[in-house]
From Swiss-Prot:
<feature type="glycosylation site" description="N-linked (GlcNAc...) asparagine">
    <location>
        <position position="94"/>
    </location>
</feature>
<feature type="transmembrane region" description="Helical">
    <location>
        <begin position="637"/>
        <end position="657"/>
    </location>
</feature>
<dbReference type="GO" id="GO:0005524">
    <property type="term" value="F:ATP binding"/>
</dbReference>
<feature type="binding site">
    <location>
        <begin position="699"/>
        <end position="707"/>
    </location>
    <ligand>
        <name>ATP</name>
    </ligand>
</feature>
<feature type="glycosylation site" description="N-linked (GlcNAc...) asparagine">
    <location>
        <position position="393"/>
    </location>
</feature>
<dbReference type="InterPro" id="IPR001245">
    <property type="entry name" value="Ser-Thr/Tyr_kinase_cat_dom"/>
</dbReference>
<feature type="glycosylation site" description="N-linked (GlcNAc...) asparagine">
    <location>
        <position position="30"/>
    </location>
</feature>
<keyword id="KW-0325">Glycoprotein</keyword>
<dbReference type="InterPro" id="IPR021720">
    <property type="entry name" value="Malectin_dom"/>
</dbReference>
<keyword id="KW-0597">Phosphoprotein</keyword>
<feature type="repeat" description="LRR 2">
    <location>
        <begin position="122"/>
        <end position="145"/>
    </location>
</feature>
<keyword id="KW-0812">Transmembrane</keyword>
<feature type="repeat" description="LRR 3">
    <location>
        <begin position="147"/>
        <end position="169"/>
    </location>
</feature>
<feature type="glycosylation site" description="N-linked (GlcNAc...) asparagine">
    <location>
        <position position="60"/>
    </location>
</feature>
<keyword id="KW-0433">Leucine-rich repeat</keyword>
<feature type="modified residue" description="Phosphoserine">
    <location>
        <position position="850"/>
    </location>
</feature>
<feature type="modified residue" description="Phosphothreonine">
    <location>
        <position position="851"/>
    </location>
</feature>
């Protein structure tokens, strides 16, 4: 009996420690009786009450502010799981009193002024109030915080002058006042803060000159001085900041020349110096900066030549010397720098030819608008290369038309149709598909994947576009922005739901225009930065750029949102007069360093435009159509008569053959009858590209058949999907996939290069995406690291692709098999939805389609799995599952986990009910955005609701992910599959609803079930596609 009692006592002790251990330990940390100083406790409670935020239980245990995480040295300020957060020092008055030393209220959408009580917390050493909507001014009482070391007010709406009392904070190491609305000059007193290591005053609103007292800031390691209205020359004393590793001076109004003292800054790894007026400088000052990895010296009136020793800068990854006055030849050693990936030399007067060799890492090259000549080296045809060679004098004879297509029209003086105008207008939907406006004007599509150094020429050589620039600090450069907003002052909202972005310079050209006067119409809508009335820090951004028409500056520091009355739902139209005298028209949008850099994301700046057009101010005399290949009307008539006769004879023969083989080639006929026919490859071409389908080139095996990597004669790497011989289902999918994907073109949909239907051979040829599929990245060997921001962008990209399929494409399409293995990643980790073999064209006038069930277990919506009830909400459900997989880094089902975690959707719901959603986030992520994580989980649960009517359309999903609208509350349990058990060969009994699968995502089991209702007692549905490992890579 005594032994039993001891056993029960032991169990009770273990239970007590498991449940109350953490609290007990925290209280043990305060055994001395140390408590928060009552004045500070009152002040902090007043501050939080004014800001309508609460002190969380992690550091406010039983009402004691300085407890838990607040006194736990292992909890760092940078930990996103703790926000808001305070830290305390409890060593005062014989360890009986705690003083508040740190306050973090970061990106919490706090609105209002800073309460006066904050300035009474004199023991503060670290204050982080960044990314809120704080208003009002900073008072002189700021000088009370003399112990302050790190002070951040960046990205708020603070105004008024900076008080001179800031000079009393002599222990300050970091000062961030960037992206605010301050006024007045930069206080001289900041120069007293001689221990400063980091200073960020970009976009702060301050003006005047850089104070002479800044010469004392010799401990500086990082300095951002950009987007300001400063006066005077760049001061010499910056050359004394010899500990600098990062320096940004962009769009400040400071004039040159660049001081020779800059040559002392040999510790720099990143130098961004741009938009300096007056004064000519050479590149002599960089001669000893051999540690640089990023060197941007854009638009600075630089003269002279590129240093011959540039090949010694072995750490250089990005070099931008564009928009200067450099001359001479390009050193061959520059193109062979091993680390260099981005090179911008455009808009200089460089001559000679391109180097004959190029380093493997160099994938983005801009040499546009120079005096380069000669033949192009062989490397220009390499795949995965962004190359802008516009406006030079290259010899292009013998160049394959598929390589740098249209470049002949964009050489110096724009020679195509020069002297014989054939067009009298053009209209372009920038960044979007072809659109017909309410006035019946056709805006041609311009949704090419223009990268950091790119150009495109339209099929009829009517217009062209050229873009250069790399967004600073952005891990995933995006050059098209999309939105589902409806705009209140136009009947053509669709025209403004996409926009072309550029990080530096964006040009549109009208080619072959009849000479005369034109009205140029530019249309804009700010769809990336929210309105400033949105009560979120994401609405505090400012975009500004310059506009030139025919070389004439027509807008300086143009701000789309401000012009629209600070509205993001109003479109803006601008009209300018231009004269065309040499058959071409140029519209140039140029970023001159102005605007905020990082709101709502890193790299949200530079030109943005929705549509471009030009119409004549005269009566045209040209046909406004591409030139006819015929030489004379007589020849045309004779040709037609002869052609009709021959066609009649041939038609009879063809009809006879077709009728004879109709049953055999029904899929060929479907392809031939398509409006937009895919490019047709010969079987021998694809055999050669894949080295006769060599097993070493095999990427995977799917239900459709094997997939091979290949290389075409033009150098393009492709993925070739080969239809399994004799597969009737495969032939149906072959046609379905061609019909579906040929009807759509989008940045987030895999690109079909063409197909082969020669004899019994059926092959599809896709762009090759080197980073494989999302499931491999998430659940594979983890050779590809996806950080949080990348996962979020992948989620947003997939959502945008589905919006296009459901709502924007000419043919509405339900994919039916959205899953992690059907989302491929390109070299920049941009997601592409692939594998349209199960896609259904969808009539949006119908409420749903009844069809046989096809898809992958684990991603199937309940109404579709149970009743074959198909709508676009079927894809929404599958997207929700993929979103959860992205958040958690695990498949939707895993038999190796404990029961409560085995099924991802069920586990997510249980955590949501307990308010512990954050536990779902992948523990392998060292950093993540808490707000985005909760948002993504909430959206995923909305997308997987049992009733399809409760699931949001994908356009609303994009708006919620983008932060344009709030995430709706999840009010009911999602429709996860609870009792429907499947295996690789049969879908067995259904004993209830909702449903849950038992197969892990990594098995990628797809199945096809009969169209009719599936019987719960006698279900003979069988997986007919089999395992789709690495499908479509």
């Amino acid at each position: 009996m005594l032994r039993l009692w001891r056993y029960l006592c032991l169990l009770l002790t273990v239970w007590f420690l498991c449940n109350f251990g953490p609290v007990y330990v925290v209280r043990a940390q305060n055994r001395t009786g140390a408590t928060t100083h009552p004045d500070e406790a009152l002040a902090l409670n007043s501050i939080f009450a004014a800001w309508r935020i609460r002190a969380p239980r992690e550091w406010n245990i039983s009402g004691e502010l300085c407890s838990g995480a607040a006194i736990d040295a292992s909890v760092l300020d940078s930990n996103p799981a703790y926000n808001p957060l305070i830290k305390c020092d409890c060593s005062f008055e014989n360890s009986t009193i705690c003083r508040i030393t740190n306050i973090k209220v970061y990106a919490m959408e706090v609105v209002g002024s800073i309460p006066q009580q904050l300035w009474t917390l004199e023991y503060l050493t670290n204050l982080n109030l960044g990314q809120n909507v704080l208003t009002g001014s900073l008072p002189p009482a700021l000088g009370n915080l003399t112990r302050m070391r790190w002070m951040t007010f960046g990205i708020n709406a603070l105004s008024g002058p900076i008080p001179k009392e800031i000079g009393l904070l002599t222990d300050l190491r970091l000062l961030s006042i960037s992206s605010n609305n301050f006024s007045g000059s930069i206080p001289d007193e900041i120069g007293r803060c001689t221990k400063l290591q980091q200073i960020y005053i970009d976009s702060s609103g301050l003006s005047g000159g850089l104070p002479v007292s800044f010469a004392n800031l010799v401990e500086l390691e990082q300095a951002w001085i950009a987007d300001m209205e400063l006066t005077g020359q760049i001061p010499d004393f910056i050359g004394d900041w010899t500990k600098l590793t990062t320096l940004r001076i962009l769009g400040t109004g400071l004039s040159g020349p660049i001081p020779a003292s800059f040559s002392n800054l040999t510790s720099l790894t990143e130098l961004r110096l741009g938009d300096i007026s007056n004064g000519n400088s050479s590149l002599e000052f960089i001669k000893d900066m051999k540690s640089l990895s990023i060197l941007v010296l854009r638009n600075n009136n630089l003269t002279g030549t590129i240093p011959s020793n540039i090949g010694e800068y072995s750490s250089l990854r990005q070099l931008d010397l564009s928009f200067n006055k450099l001359h001479g030849t390009i050193p061959a050693s520059l193109f062979n720098l091993r680390q260099l990936t981005h090179l911008f030399l455009g808009n200089n007067t460089l001559n000679g030819s391109l180097p004959t060799q190029k380093g493997q890492s160099l994938s983005n090259v801009d040499v546009s608008y120079n005096d380069l000549s000669g033949s192009l080296p062989s490397w220009v045809s390499l795949p995965n290369l962004n190359l802008n060679l516009v406006a030079n004098n290259f010899t292009l004879e013998g160049l394959d038309n598929r390589v740098l297509s249209g470049l002949n029209c964009l050489q110096k003086n724009f020679p195509c149709n020069r002297g014989k105008g054939i067009y009298s207008d053009f209209s372009i939907n920038c960044g979007g598909p072809e659109i017909r406006s309410v006035t019946e004007a056709v805006f041609e599509r311009e949704d090419e994947d223009l990268g950091p150094a790119s150009f495109v020429v339209s099929a009829g050589q009517r217009w062209a576009a050229s873009s250069v620039g790399l967004f600073a600090g952005s891990s995933n450069n995006i050059y098209i922005s999309t939105s589902q907003s409806q705009f209140v002052n136009t009947l053509d909202s669709e025209l403004f739901q996409s926009a072309r972005l550029s990080a530096s310079s964006l040009r549109y050209y009208g080619l072959g225009l009849e000479n005369g006067g034109y009205t140029v119409t530019l249309q804009f809508a700010e769809i990336q930065i929210l309105g400033s009335t949105s009560n979120t820090w994401r609405g505090l951004g400012r975009r500004r750029f310059d506009i030139y028409v025919q070389g004439r500056l027509v807008e300086k520091d143009f701000d789309v949102r401000r012009t629209a009355g600070d509205s993001t739902v109003r479109a803006v139209q601008r009209e300018y007069k231009a004269n065309v005298s040499q058959n071409h028209l140029e519209i140039h949008l140029f970023w001159a360093g102005k605007g905020t850099c990082c709101i709502p994301i890193q790299g949200a700046y530079g030109p943005l435009i929705s549509a471009v057009g030009a119409t004549p101010d005269f009566t045209p005399t040209v046909g406004n159509r591409p030139p006819s290949k015929g030489k004379s009307m007589t020849g045309t008539i004779v040709g037609v008569i002869v052609g009709v006769g021959l066609l009649s004879i041939i038609s009879g023969v063809v009809i006879f053959i077709i009728r004879k083989r109709r049953k055999r080639y029904t899929d060929d006929e479907e392809i031939l009858s398509m409006d937009v026919k895919p490019y047709t490859f010969t079987y021998s071409e694809l055999k050669s590209a894949t080295q006769d389908f060599d097993p070493s080139n095999k990427l995977g095996e799917g239900g459709f058949g094997p997939v091979y990597k290949g290389k075409l004669n033009d150098g393009r790497e492709v993925a070739v999907k080969l239809l399994s011989v004799g597969s009737r289902q495969g032939k149906g999918q072959f046609v379905a996939e061609i019909v579906a994907i040929s009807a759509v073109q989008h940045r987030n949909l895999v690109k079909l290069y063409g197909c082969c239907y020669e004899g019994e051979h059926r092959l599809l040829v896709y762009e090759y995406l080197p980073n494989g599929s999302l499931d491999q990245a998430l659940f594979g060997e983890k050779t590809l690291h996806l950080d949080w921001s990348t996962r979020y962008e992948i989620c947003l990209g997939v959502a945008r692709g589905l919006v296009y399929l459901h709502e924007e494409a000419r043919l509405r399409i339900v994919h039916r098999d959205v899953k992690a293995s059907n989302i491929l990643l390109d070299s920049k980790l941009v997601p592409k939805v692939s594998d349209f073999g199960l896609a259904k064209l969808y009539d949006d006038k119908k409420t749903h389609i009844s069809t046989r069930v096809a898809g992958t277990i684990g991603y199937l919506a309940p109404e579709y799995a149970m009743r074959g009830h198909l709508t676009e909400k079927t894809d929404v459900y599958a997207f929700g599952v993929v979103a959860l997989e992205l958040v958690s880094g695990r498949p939707n089902s895993d038999e190796n986990l404990e029961d409560e975690k085995r099924y991802l959707l069920e586990w997510a719901w249980n955590l949501h009910e307990k308010g512990r959603e954050v536990e779902l986030i992948d523990h392998q992520l060292t950093e993540f955005n808490m707000e985005e994580g909760k948002r993504m989980i909430g959206i995923a649960l909305l997308c997987t609701q049992t009733s399809h009517a409760l699931r949001p359309p994908m356009s609303r999903v994009v708006a919620m992910l983008s932060g344009d609208v709030e995430v709706s509350d999840v009010t009911s349990k999602p429709g996860y599959l609870t009792d429907w058990r499947f295996d690789d060969t049969t879908a067995s009994s259904i004993s209830g609803f909702p449903l849950r699968n038992t197969q892990a995502s990594e098995s990628f089991t797809s199945f096809v079930a009969p169209r009719s209702e599936i019987s719960p007692r006698n279900n003979d549905a069988r997986p007919m596609l089999g395992a789709q490992m690495n499908e479509g890579r």
